[in-house]
């Protein structure tokens, strides 16, 4: 195979970090393979099918890789009231609120299923109009619902659960996928594989000039928050979370020098000033202190005047780390407190004590933190 088209399926506008790392991984190993990234989130709904068709017609890919990030309906973010309506429908004491919530819920269900149908239509478009192209699909949403979605995708489409670097490389080279987390439908038969060794993160960095050349829409993210990954995996066992299933429970760390190199490239070449660590948790535990500390120290040493954030367990913040976080430019933080009851937290296997969470917030305040701690 000589060409790959990556298609980031529609979701809220968020920097498509996954496909950028995939493209860079392949480029470093197969520099002769042509690649292109298409972000469908940046097109109006009515133009997305044409965008896929035009990109495939112009680029003539041998392999089309779809990245499906979001599928959930209850998204507790600004502008999405699904969760509020669900609570009103089940628990509101006012009957009128329940009636209103029921109609709103039907509308949201319609939008939800319409979104799924639309996302599925793009692989089908490729299968029908460009039948010689091999289709692959992955991402968080697909990984979570792979058994259901593979039934609705074109036969022969290769689904990847979790990480896709090694799987894509093997498809390009014509190797077997038996040691990868793949799923494939052939008629009524479903084939699956199990991953052997996960991808090596020490080689995972971004050649930004190359990325800029294969991602024409990058300008839409100038001034936006840019995703950077410092580690993969999550050691916790929260009852509602899929990160350990998607990335594994063993935490794998990128060298701090490479993490900050990513930040520095975007800072100097794209003018980026806001960054989001896409890790399941930036501080996964005490064993993460050396890496986190070195990353923040390197940001300071390189005089990168940025604002950064990510998912943070404030229960793991020490007074020393809090000072370093503030000095290096930490912005608003999202903290998954979930409940103010320790009993509930224990039942959900959250793995932290409320007292320690409060301590971390206090350390940040004492260090001069001026941002917001957003509880969810």
State where each predicted segment sits.
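Conserved beta-strand segments of the P-loop GTPase G domain that flank and frequently precede/overlap
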Residues: 66-67, 374-376
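Radical SAM [4Fe-4S] cluster-binding motif and immediate context
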Residues: 202-371
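Catalytic metal-binding/acid-base residues of hydrolase active sites
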Residues: 141-142, 281, 376
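Structural motif
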Residues: 136-140, 311, 374
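Acidic, low-complexity intrinsically disordered segments
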Residues: 1-262, 267-271
